């Protein structure tokens, strides 16, 4: 079934988002487990720490989105990579905006 329980409420997903999120989590965990990718993630951390994480992430989102249906055919891994780099971009966004968003939240909810 396409539902889950959140805050004691039943929610029906229209586009199987719950399954997609589970699949994405498995994909991400596998990328961390793969030996050859340990250096890749170390490089990604250096890029993010160097202040270039957003451009790097957006560039990879575009790369894999454009590649879908071409280089490897309709490879679901290209879509999972788009989502993973989107999460990295969200992480970078949150790092760069954490203080201002926290202050904005406090002012809206006080």
Language model features with spans:
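Intrinsically disordered, low-complexity regulatory regions
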Residues: 2-110
């Amino acid at each position: 079934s396409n539902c889950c329980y959140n805050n004691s409420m039943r929610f029906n997903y229209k586009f199987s988002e719950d399954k997609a999120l589970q699949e994405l989590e498995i994909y991400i965990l596998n990328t961390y487990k793969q030996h050859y990718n340990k250096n890749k993630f170390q490089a990604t951390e250096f890029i993010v720490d160097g202040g270039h994480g957003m451009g790097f992430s957006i560039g990879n989102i575009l790369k894999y989105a454009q590649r879908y249906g071409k280089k490897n055919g309709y490879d679901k891994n290209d879509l999972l990579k788009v989502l993973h780099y989107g999460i990295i971009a969200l992480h970078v966004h949150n790092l760069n905006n954490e203080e201002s968003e926290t202050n904005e939240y406090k002012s809206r909810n006080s």
